[in-house]
Amino acid sequence: MARLVGVDLPRDKRMEVALTYIFGIGRTRSNEILAATGIDRDLRTRDLTEEQLIHLRDYIEANLKVEGDLRREVQADIRRKIEIGCYQGLRHRRGMPVRGQRTKTNARTRKGPKRTIAGKKKAR
């Protein structure tokens, strides 16, 4: 099994798809990497030569921020926003949607399960 930047790539997938298993690499960036390294995107991971694997590894490590480094950077950005107290930081702190989505209804993933509030007693 081919291993790049700490991730085992699936053996039977095309390289175009296999590279997307790395955090920070999507379909577009995957195609850019393969074009820059001169590797056919229809090639299966199991058919990669050791030389191609080394070329891919060197290119990714030299030009891209992926996996742990990228995760740390994203977390640092969120922490910074919380510390400076900007609107997005407040939304992160409160566990609410950050990008302007509605919250009167929906937003359950971000807000968590409903907390039932006792309603008014009916007057008779």
Swiss-Prot record:
Classification via SUPFAM superfamilies: S13-like H2TH domain (SSF46946)
Region (Disordered): 94-124
GO cellular-component term (any): small ribosomal subunit
Pfam families: Ribosomal_S13
Keywords: Ribonucleoprotein, Ribosomal protein, RNA-binding, rRNA-binding, tRNA-binding
Superkingdom of the source species: Bacteria
A molecular-function term among this protein's GO annotations: structural constituent of ribosome
Protein's GO biological process: translation
Gene3D superfamilies associated with the record: 1.10.8.50, 30s ribosomal protein s13, domain 2
InterPro entries with a match to the protein in the record: Rbsml_uS13_C, Ribosomal_uS13, Ribosomal_uS13-like_H2TH, Ribosomal_uS13_bac-type, Ribosomal_uS13_CS
Subunit description: Part of the 30S ribosomal subunit. Forms a loose heterodimer with protein S19. Forms two bridges to the 50S subunit in the 70S ribosome.
Role description: Located at the top of the head of the 30S subunit, it contacts several helices of the 16S rRNA. In the 70S ribosome it contacts the 23S rRNA (bridge B1a) and protein L5 of the 50S subunit (bridge B1b), connecting the 2 subunits; these bridges are implicated in subunit movement. Contacts the tRNAs in the A and P-sites.
PANTHER family: 30S RIBOSOMAL PROTEIN S13/40S RIBOSOMAL PROTEIN S18, SMALL RIBOSOMAL SUBUNIT PROTEIN US13M
HAMAP family: Ribosomal_uS13 (MF_01315)
Family the entry assigns: Belongs to the universal ribosomal protein uS13 family.
Protein name per the record: Small ribosomal subunit protein uS13
Natural source organism: Mycobacterium tuberculosis (strain ATCC 25618 / H37Rv)
